[in-house]
Amino acid sequence: MFAVAGAGRALGYICAPVFFQRVIAACVDEPVNASAYAANRELLTQGLDELGYHYIAPDGAFYLWMQALEPDAQAFSDKAKERELLLVPSDSFGVGGWVRVSYCVSADVIRNSMPAFAALKRDYE
């Protein structure tokens, strides 16, 4: 299924080719296991809570919105990148002051990112 999702994303068509329409039709009734996303969301939010970050936890996405520690979300994202954290500034979505944090990674990546989130927070204290 990942290969299908990856190929469709890379194509970027509004009207998918017939082949992809047939593949999706064959897969549409397949069960989705979202438990890994829920576990990762819990792991990330627990870590952010311990560090005192403010965020909005989603009900069904694979990312959350975290309040940037300065009004300029792009500058905050650039500072995070120095800590090897890749955050998407909300300016791209028409709102400032927030960043999007994805948790569609392994649990180890989330665990290993917490020291960087802690260091980033210290940069603003």
Segments and roles (model prediction):
Residues 1-125:
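PLP-dependent class I/II
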